[in-house]
């Protein structure tokens, strides 16, 4: 127990230490200030702009920024679909893999272009090295940079700046942040035992005389951007539970830190943009405290173990089902909460084997989307709740709602409400349909309370652009591929459109002078109220589902049945 808690504590301390450093660096990149990589990256970026015809000094309006995102993502999606469809004709296919079915290719492309990386296939038996690295690896960089650009544009709008240029933000996000850190991280992973090869699957003879096939590939480079970009899609079916993706405790620590580094730093980045570091730290600690509570809930459940198993065997041991022994209950519980909090979706153990407490914590993260949140967009979601808090507290005390010196009016509240309503709509309605018809129910491996969790988790993960799943669900079917694709697209692009329109609206407003009656948003009281509103809205929206799923399952286990 002590060792497990020490591992969790060490990881959290590292997160706190790197947040201001990386947050300040990200701010310098997108504020156009000098950075250590200027000498190397400036010529590369200028070449990219010249070749693509981008004028980096041109500012975009909200709709121009939105159209740039949609057109770019559509083009990249069509390109990658074509690459996967013709993978049998392309190089780096030593195992001679053919073409997957059209629906799995469509789901995969939609999933990766939106930074969701939900996988209904096994990478080592479905996709060639070229499809994994050149096609999906390309999307891992661009989808992460797209989310990062949205988050930065949203922060610019809230702080009274123009939104910027999407193509410039996309390029700088890759060249100055994602690519350099990924290169360093990939080298570290190679040194720690993660393979990086284009050799074919090995065929070996075991000690018993049998034949075993060992899949391998260019894993290290794929793995690092998978974690850093909050992508989460694994090179192998077992994801980061596979010893070739995550062989030991040190690689596990590196990947865990990479997973949370940018979402945590983005809160500090806002503080630099707004010139209000105090508020950034208040918001950071608000998110951090809720995160630690959820880790405590999940870790406590795993440490307690399964009461039915322990009672039958007459022992007291943690729940080790679905876990890698090299990580144990503590690192698996921390990872499970972190991967759903950051919308990464990678796993180092099977979430379907989590105790009800752990399942509650992971679902709660998927429902809220702000306990760190996704790449860039999570920060935007956090400030949506901040805007609603200002509006509600202003109504209660009779003050005109203002935030960052700008009035909050009907348009902003309508857009904020739309952003928060889309997620439950594209989670709960498809879940109800899936639970109502036999053709979708056939994929559920557990007909009880856990079966409800399997279905809701699948759609919550899709809509939140997380990508993890309770793998007791047989999800590689036409229904699940198409229905989750719809949830992914709606949950990704509708909020992004609304966020950018809201930011554009705020950027055009005149600054209102502060008065003694102005509500201060950088106070402990206001931050506490914000946390309360976040939790209340999350509980009110999804509590019936939580009650029918992990809460009911927990009571059933506690009763000994």
From Swiss-Prot:
Keywords (alphabetical) are: Cell inner membrane, Cell membrane, Ion transport, Membrane, Potassium, Potassium transport, Transmembrane, Transmembrane helix, Transport
- Provide the protein's localization: Cell inner membrane
Entry membrane topology: Multi-pass membrane protein
What are the protein's GO molecular function terms?
Answer: P-type potassium transmembrane transporter activity; potassium ion binding
- Mention any Pfam family matching this sequence: KdpA
Instruction: Give TM segment ranges.
Output: 2-22, 66-86, 135-155, 177-197, 253-273, 280-300, 327-347, 354-374, 378-398, 413-433, 482-502, 531-551
**Principal localisation:** membrane
InterPro entries cross-referenced by the UniProt entry: KdpA
Q: Name one GO cellular component term.
A: plasma membrane
| Summary of the function given for this chain in its UniProt record | Part of the high-affinity ATP-driven potassium transport (or Kdp) system, which catalyzes the hydrolysis of ATP coupled with the electrogenic transport of potassium into the cytoplasm. This subunit binds the periplasmic potassium ions and delivers the ions to the membrane domain of KdpB through an intramembrane tunnel.
Regarding protein family, the annotation reads: Belongs to the KdpA family.
Record text on subunit structure and interactions: The system is composed of three essential subunits: KdpA, KdpB and KdpC.
This one is known as Potassium-transporting ATPase potassium-binding subunit
Native organism is Nostoc sp. (strain PCC 7120 / SAG 25.82 / UTEX 2576)
């Amino acid at each position: 127990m002590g060792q497990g808690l020490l591992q969790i504590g060490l990881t959290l301390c590292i997160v706190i230490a790197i947040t201001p450093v990386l947050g300040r660096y990200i701010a310098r990149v997108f504020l156009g200030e000098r950075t250590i990589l200027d000498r190397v990256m400036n010529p590369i970026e200028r070449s990219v702009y010249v070749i693509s015809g981008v004028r980096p000094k041109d500012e975009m309006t909200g709709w121009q920024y939105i159209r740039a995102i949609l057109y770019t993502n559509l083009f990249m999606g069509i390109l990658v679909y074509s690459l996967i469809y013709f993978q049998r004709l392309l190089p780096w296919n030593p195992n001679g893999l053919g073409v997957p079915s059209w629906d799995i290719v469509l789901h995969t492309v939609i999933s990766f272009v939106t930074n969701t990386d939900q996988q209904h296939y096994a990478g080592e038996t479905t996709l060639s090295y070229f499809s994994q690295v050149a096609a999906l690896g390309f999307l891992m960089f661009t989808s992460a940079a797209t989310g990062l650009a949205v988050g930065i544009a949203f922060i610019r709008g809230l702080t009274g700046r123009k939104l910027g240029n999407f193509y410039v933000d996309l390029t700088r996000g890759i060249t100055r942040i994602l690519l350099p850190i990924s290169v360093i991280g990939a080298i570290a992973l190679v040194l720690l035992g993660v393979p990086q090869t284009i050799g074919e699957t090995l065929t070996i003879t075991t000690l018993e005389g049998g034949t075993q096939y060992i899949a391998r590939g260019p894993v290290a480079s794929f793995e690092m951007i998978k974690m850093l970009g909050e992508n989460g899609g694994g090179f192998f079916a077992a994801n980061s539970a596979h010893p070739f993706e995550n062989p030991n405790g040190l690689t596990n620590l590196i990947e865990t830190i990479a997973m949370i580094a940018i979402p945590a730093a983005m809160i500090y980045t806002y503080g630099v943009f707004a010139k209000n570091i105090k508020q950034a730290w208040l918001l950071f600690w608000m998110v951090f405290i809720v995160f630690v509570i959820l880790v405590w809930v999940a870790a406590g459940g795993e440490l307690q173990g399964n009461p039915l198993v322990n009672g039958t065997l007459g022992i007291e041991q943690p729940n080790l089902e679905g876990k890698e022994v090299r990580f144990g209950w503590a690192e698996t519980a921390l990872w499970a909460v972190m991967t759903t909090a950051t919308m990464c979706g990678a796993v180092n153990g099977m979430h379907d084997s989590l105790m009800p407490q752990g399942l509650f914590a992971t679902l709660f993260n998927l429902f809220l989307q702000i306990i760190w949140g996704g790449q860039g967009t999570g920060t935007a979601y956090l400030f949506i709740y901040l805007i609603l808090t200002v509006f509600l507290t202003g109504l209660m005390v009779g003050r005109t709602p203002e935030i960052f010196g700008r009035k909050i009016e009907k348009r902003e509240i309508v857009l904020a409400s739309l952003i928060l309503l889309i997620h439950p709509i594209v989670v709960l309605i498809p879940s109800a349909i899936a639970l109502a018809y036999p053709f979708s129910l056939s994929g559920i491996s557990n007909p009880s309370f856990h079966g409800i969790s399997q279905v809701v988790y699948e759609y919550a993960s899709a809509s939140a652009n997380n990508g993890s799943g309770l793998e007791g669900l047989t999800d590689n079917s036409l229904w699940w591929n198409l229905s989750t694709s719809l949830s992914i697209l709606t949950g990704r692009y509708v909020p992004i459109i609304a966020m950018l329109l809201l930011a554009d609206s705020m950027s055009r407003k005149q600054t209102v002078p502060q008065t003694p009656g102005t509500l201060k948003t950088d106070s402990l009281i206001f931050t506490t109220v914000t946390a309360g509103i976040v939790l209340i809205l999350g509980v009110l929206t999804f509590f019936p589902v939580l009650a029918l799923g992990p809460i009911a399952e927990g009571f059933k286990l506690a009763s000994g049945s």
